[in-house]
């Protein structure tokens, strides 16, 4: 599938269905065993991982969203690019890549109750599940995260 601005990666953060535009995603890493923890780092930072010689910080999205962290056998890291810096997002499971028309995304949504409204830019439906389209710049914004 050729990636375009209508493609979204669907994934779970615990039991929450979430989505990111494929234009924001660099790659998906399914092997999470090689994360090196950083002593005295923020609770929402899982650690760092070496990706082809590049050190990437990994943010634990359940902890970042103030949710319980339940490790599963399907955990993955979604690597995103933020201002030419790679950041890994630790998620519970990557489910699919789908094509979505803009009209399918409600941009003034009622946000799933577990998520801070700043982290969500819209909602859509995926397999009858309300799916939060995440606002990546806000998730990666340190100031927003510190005020939560």
Feature annotation, model-predicted:
Residues 1-148:
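An acidic, low-aromatic, low-complexity terminal/linker signal
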């Amino acid at each position: 599938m050729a990636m375009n601005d209508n493609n979204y990666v669907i994934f779970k953060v615990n039991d929450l269905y979430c989505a990111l535009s494929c234009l924001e995603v660099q790659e998906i890493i399914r092997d999470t065993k090689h994360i090196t923890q950083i002593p005295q780092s923020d609770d929402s930072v899982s650690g760092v991982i070496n990706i082809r010689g590049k050190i990437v910080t990994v943010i634990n999205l359940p902890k970042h969203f103030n949710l319980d962290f339940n490790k599963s056998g399907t955990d993955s890291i979604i690597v995103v690019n933020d201002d030419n810096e790679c950041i890994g997002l630790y998620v519970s499971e990557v489910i699919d890549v789908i094509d979505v028309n803009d009209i399918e995304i409600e941009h003034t949504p009622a946000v799933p109750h577990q998520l801070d409204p700043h982290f969500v830019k819209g909602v859509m439906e995926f397999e009858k599940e309300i799916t939060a389209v995440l606002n990546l710049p806000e998730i990666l914004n340190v100031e927003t995260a510190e005020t939560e």
